[in-house]
Curated annotation (Swiss-Prot):
Pfam families: Fe-S_biosyn. The gene is erpA. PROSITE patterns: HESB. One of its GO terms (biological process) is iron-sulfur cluster assembly. Required for insertion of 4Fe-4S clusters for at least IspG. This is Iron-sulfur cluster insertion protein ErpA. One of its GO terms (cellular component) is cytosol. Iron-sulfur cluster binds at C42, C106, C108. Keywords: Iron, Iron-sulfur, Metal-binding.
Length: 114
């Protein structure tokens, strides 16, 4: 299922630029960013990001500015209305999620609770 959920999870321009850059470095234009939720972290759930070329039957693909995100339906329900950004600062660089569904978020921003 592609783009039916585009308005439910979006990328910032910084995230799009970084994803495109990483795909260029890998020289594999079939790569898509997969986000999924795992149990763990200090707040109960953790965001996980990987580049992937395989798409499962129930995966949802969201494409924005020629960048594709793969997400499974269960993870999407936790991220509904969210935004993926890319942050660079003195502490390092990482993809982060602005999640309107999170009741609590840990200080590093990589885990949350609902």
């Amino acid at each position: 299922m592609e783009n039916a959920f585009k308005s439910h999870l979006q990328f910032t321009e910084k995230a799009i630029k970084k994803i495109k850059n990483l795909i260029e470095i890998e020289k594999n234009h079939d790569l898509k960013l997969r986000i999924y939720i795992n149990g763990g972290g200090c707040s109960g759930f953790q965001y996980q990001f990987i580049f992937d070329t395989s798409i499962n039957e129930d995966d949802i693909i969201i494409t924005q500015s020629e960048v594709s995100l793969i997400i499974d339906p269960i993870s999407l329900q936790y991220l509904y209305g969210g935004q993926i950004d890319y942050l660079e600062n003195l502490e390092g660089s990482k993809f982060i999620v602005y999640n309107p569904n999170a009741k609590n978020t840990c200080g590093c921003g990589s885990s949350f609770s609902i």
